[in-house]
Amino acid sequence: MNVSSFLLAIDSGNTAIKWGLHTGDQWLVRGSALQSERMVLKQAWALLPAPPASVLISNVAGLQAADDLTALLKPWYVQPHWITASASQCGVTSRYTKPEQLGCDRWAALIAAWYRVQRACLVVDVGTAMTVDTLSSTGEFLGGIIVPGPDAMKQALAGCAGTLAAPVSSCFQNFPVNTENALYSGMIQALSGALERMYRLLSSYSEKQTLTEVIMTGGGAALLAQHIHIPHRIVDSLVLEGLAIIAKSGNFDYNKK
């Protein structure tokens, strides 16, 4: 095992930070922390079996999160690389009008998904927001949608309707018979409906497109997966996988936060 090639990959999302130490072939250790508890990372990283030789970061949580991560990385004297989306990378090409404006987490997830399946698929990240992105059978990112995730929907309802916030005990019903279940079921229907509609759209995009599954990731993936009726798999830490693939390709040079 060549410790001089260890990569620390960091996925700094809106709510949580996921990280992993990669050997070039496999994950040696992985962990996570809430954005509100970033200093927990200092303790976790102090226990790493070896210092990273490189650091690759996907950050969508803003400049303060970037500054805090930079400070936490200083003891290793390693210059972190902050990825951005591009027109083409690691076999994936982008149709985005301005490719660099695509969220770097979405881009890393697309690269990981393409590396896994090499065919047309949906890449679904269920977090603070839910993104549903489309990949063609040739690795072309056709575009995608962004909708509020489960927690964001709950908070929005609580903010505008106070007592209408769905309690934890709410459950899904096809035909809800109380207000709490109506709110919860509506949230599930909205998210699963958006996902399944995108599935149908990609399926009809071209006769040559063959969808075999949906690749799901994010904190809300397991919840939503219970309510969709299309082939799918859940991949934990898909963004980290994408970062490891990008790092291994050597096709990056992003030092700006």
UniProtKB/Swiss-Prot annotation:
ATP binds at residues 11-18, 128. Substrate binds at residues 96, 103-106, 179. It catalyses: (R)-pantothenate + ATP = (R)-4'-phosphopantothenate + ADP + H(+). A monovalent cation. Ammonium or potassium. InterPro entries: ATPase_NBD (IPR043129), Type_III_PanK (IPR004619). One of its GO terms (biological process) is coenzyme A biosynthetic process. It comes from the Bacteria. Pathway: Cofactor biosynthesis; coenzyme A biosynthesis; CoA from (R)-pantothenate: step 1/5. GO terms for molecular function: ATP binding; metal ion binding; pantothenate kinase activity. Its cofactor is NH4(+); K(+). It holds the Pfam family Pan_kinase. K(+) binds at residue 125. Keywords: ATP-binding, Coenzyme A biosynthesis, Cytoplasm, Kinase, Metal-binding, Nucleotide-binding, Potassium, Transferase. Catalyzes the phosphorylation of pantothenate (Pan), the first step in CoA biosynthesis. Belongs to the type III pantothenate kinase family. Homodimer. This is Type III pantothenate kinase. It comes from Nitrosomonas eutropha (strain DSM 101675 / C91 / Nm57). The gene is coaX.
